[in-house]
């Protein structure tokens, strides 16, 4: 599972996920990618399950880049616990995703096969996405 090695503070405030992505919104390494088209939150398990689905479909050919990293701790209190007595313990690590963010990239795979693999990964993600190529990337949403 992806998570930071160490953080300055153990717990964070929830915050708000507004606006569109100004960083990580263009293809940098590959030639075909998955781009988010709505707000969402992705955790380390979802990142890993989508990566496994893609790499199994392409049979380890080519190269896959994960362009997101879960660096925000999500806390939860145990079930059937009364309110109060402090904030819950860290349950999982997440990343807030804004529209326009590139989530995965691929290189060195035939486009038809790459689209099938990315479609498998799309079904594992909790927000709407679209497949973009270097040529079609200028269309933001």
Swiss-Prot record:
UniProt keyword annotations, A-Z: Ribonucleoprotein, Ribosomal protein, RNA-binding, rRNA-binding, tRNA-binding
Disordered: annotated span: 1-23
GO-annotated biological processes: translation
InterPro entries for the chain: Ribosomal_uL16 (IPR047873), Ribosomal_uL16_bact-type (IPR000114), Ribosomal_uL16_CS (IPR020798), Ribosomal_uL16_dom (IPR016180), Ribosomal_uL16_sf (IPR036920)
GO cellular component, one term: cytosolic large ribosomal subunit
CDD domains: Ribosomal_L16_L10e
Family assignment from sequence similarity: Belongs to the universal ribosomal protein uL16 family.
Record function comment: Binds 23S rRNA and is also seen to make contacts with the A and possibly P site tRNAs.
Subunit (UniProt): Part of the 50S ribosomal subunit.
Protein name: Large ribosomal subunit protein uL16
């Amino acid at each position: 599972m992806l998570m930071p090695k160490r953080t300055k503070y153990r717990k964070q405030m929830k915050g708000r996920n507004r606006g569109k992505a100004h960083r990580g919104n263009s293809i940098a390494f590959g030639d075909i990618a998955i781009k988010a088209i709505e707000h969402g939150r992705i955790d380390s398990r979802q990142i890993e399950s989508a990566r496994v689905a893609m790499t199994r479909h392409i049979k380890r050919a080519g190269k896959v880049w994960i362009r997101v990293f879960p660096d925000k701790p999500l806390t939860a209190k145990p079930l059937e616990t009364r309110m109060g007595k402090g904030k819950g313990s860290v349950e999982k690590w997440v990343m807030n995703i804004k529209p326009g963010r590139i989530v995965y990239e691929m290189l060195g795979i035939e486009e038809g096969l790459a689209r099938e693999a990315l479609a498998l990964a799309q079904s594992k993600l909790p927000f709407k996405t679209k497949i973009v190529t270097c040529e079609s990337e200028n269309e933001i949403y």
